[in-house]
C-alpha cells in the first residue's frame, strides 16, 4: 500500500483518544494527520492541550506532539483534512449523534467508540471476528444520509468482550441462557488511580448504564439484517451485573451458561481455540493471530498475566467447569481500552478498508 489513509481523531485529548494515537503510531495503513477536541483545546499544540494528562504507558508519539488541535465542532474544516475519522468525543448522547452524522454527511466515514449510535437501526455495531457482515447495512444508511462515501460504524461496549466471543464460538451448542458478572477496570471510566483515588482498596457495585448494554448489545451483534436494518437475536437471554474494581486495565467476567445441546469440555475448548474470523483470514495489521486462548491453570486468566495477550487484542478464557445450576461456567478477560475500545475500533476500520468501504478521498 503506497499512500496511507489520512486519519482524524475526534476527542483526541481524552483517554480513548490518546489510546487511538498510541495504537496508530507507525500503523502500516493509517496516519494521524488531524487531532480535534473541544474549543478550549483548539489552537494549542496537541502536546500543550494534553499537558500532564497523558495516560498511556508509552510516550506521546513525536509525530502528533506539534499537531495543532482543531475545534471538533468545525466539522467541514476538520473533514477537509482527512479520509476518515475515529470518534471518541465526550459529549451528551444527542450531541454525539448529531456531530457524527454531520461528519458522515461531509462524505467522511466515522468509526466510533461512542455508544450514541449503537442502536441506530442502520448503523453497524461490529466485533470484526463476529459480525463483519453487518457492514452491509452501510449502503442503506448512506441512502438515508444522502451520502456516497460517508457513513457511521460503531464498536460495542467494552464489558461484553470478555464473554460474547466465547458464546459466539459456542453457537453450534445453542446457548440460550447466560448469567454474567463483570469486574471492570477504572480506565473504562477514563480514569487512573491518580485522578480517582477513592477507587483504591474499593469496589463500587454499580456502573451507570453498563448492565443494560451488557445484556442487550450481544443480541444486536448476533442479529440478522432485514430490510436494511439490524434485527437483534432473541437468544441467549443474558442477565448481568457490572462492578467497578480497583484495577487499571482489564475487564474480567464470570459467566454461567445453559445450552440446548450440552457440550463436553473438550468440545467447548476446541471451539474456543479454533475460532477465527475475517480479521485472521485477511491477516489485518491489528488482528490477533489467536483471537481466544484457553488457559488450563486454576488461577488464570489473571489481569497481570493475561490482559496484554496478543497486544491486548486477544481474549483469555479459563476455569471452564460444569455447574450445579447451569451447564457450564467460565471466567473471561479482555483489555478494555485496547480490544474493548480503541483497538477494536482500529480493527473495524482495517476491516472496512479491506472490504472497500473506506478509501482515500
Model-predicted regions and their roles:
Residues 1-205, 236-237, 309, 315-316, ...:
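N-terminal Rossmann-like NAD(P) cofactor-binding subdomain of oxidoreductases
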Residues 187-361:
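Charged docking surfaces used in two-component/phosphorelay signaling
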